[in-house]
């Protein structure tokens, strides 16, 4: 049996890791295809190293672009690869444009499609990821859900129970696996008592007004804050000339994106 994984961003690499370990344990051949949606080394390559995942056989190198551009590039480049590799099944993860593009492509080729982290819903149709996850769920042959709520969501949408499999939260599985190995790492690099902050959602970086509201909110917090700066957030803060304000907040420690192991340590130690 040969299984193909299609991934494109950091959360998907994390979800892939525990699934890959199980496939290897059962001596199932696997192929990893990286769409290249995250192409910065700190945002991509380091995760494969730290999670001990096999390097991708192929990187589509789609880079950034509009939702339609990225989705179309992935579909056009992926189709031939899937046809040549002839996998017995394809696994997609989460709710990115990579997930959407892969789900459409694989479904049209009539190859069994498995969706890990299926059934999650925000019921906010303006959210791009919500659109992606709904389409991926309804095209998938088997849907691996993290919890009962997700399973119920799928049943309400008419998906038969025999296609829904309760797998639990693979992200949490990987967190427990990693933290057991790296509990004492990075001592001294960060404050003893801190709040961990990430900031990258499209709706939170879409306007100067929105960014200023978030800055005003964190300025009222009297704890040390460790902000992991996403490239998108870095770009818009620069475009709106707000770096001086960011630097004036003495409680705010801004750091570049970190690898997965370091992130699990930060999560384990933060307030």
Language model: regions and residue ranges:
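N-terminal beta-loop-helix "entrance" segment that forms/cooperates
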Residues: 38-54
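Structural motif
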Residues: 2, 88-89, 194, 271
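Short internal beta-strands
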Residues: 30-37, 143, 225-231
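A short, Lys/Arg-enriched amphipathic alpha-helix followed by its capping loop at the start of a domain
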Residues: 19-28, 217-221
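Active-site and donor-binding regions of nucleotide-sugar-utilizing enzymes
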Residues: 4-9, 13-22, 47, 59-158
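A nucleotide-sugar donor-handling region in carbohydrate enzymes
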Residues: 38-42, 61, 139-210
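Donor-nucleotide binding loops and adjacent catalytic segments primarily
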Residues: 45, 181-269
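Short, glycine-rich nucleotide/cofactor-binding loops
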Residues: 3-13, 200-209
């Amino acid at each position: 049996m040969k299984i193909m994984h299609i991934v494109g961003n950091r959360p998907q690499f994390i979800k892939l890791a525990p699934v890959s370990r199980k496939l290897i344990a059962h001596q199932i051949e696997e192929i990893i295809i990286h769409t290249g949606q995250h192409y910065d080394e700190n945002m991509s390559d380091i995760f494969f190293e730290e999670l001990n995942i096999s390097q991708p056989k192929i990187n589509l190198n789609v880079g950034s672009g509009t939702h339609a551009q990225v989705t179309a590039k992935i579909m056009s480049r992926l189709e031939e690869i899937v046809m040549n590799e002839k996998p017995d099944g394809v696994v997609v993860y989460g709710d990115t444009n990579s997930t959407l593009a892969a789900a459409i492509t694989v479904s049209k080729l009539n190859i069994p499609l498995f969706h890990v982290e299926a059934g999650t819903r925000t019921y906010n149709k303006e959210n791009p990821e919500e659109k992606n996850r709904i389409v991926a769920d309804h095209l998938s042959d088997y849907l691996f859900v993290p919890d009962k709520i997700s399973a119920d969501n799928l049943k309400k949408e008419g998906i038969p129970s025999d296609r829904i499999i309760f797998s639990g939260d693979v992200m949490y599985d990987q967190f427990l696996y990693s933290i057991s190995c790296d509990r004492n790492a990075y001592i001294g690099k960060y404050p003893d008592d801190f709040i961990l902050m990430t900031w990258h959602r499209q709706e939170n970086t879409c306007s100067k007004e929105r960014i200023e509201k978030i800055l005003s909110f964190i300025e009222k917090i009297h704890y040390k804050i460790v902000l992991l700066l996403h490239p998108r957030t870095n770009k818009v803060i620069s475009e709106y000339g707000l770096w001086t304000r960011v630097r004036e907040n003495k409680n705010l420690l801004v750091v570049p994106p970190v690898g997965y192991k370091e992130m699990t340590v930060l999560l384990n130690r933060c307030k």
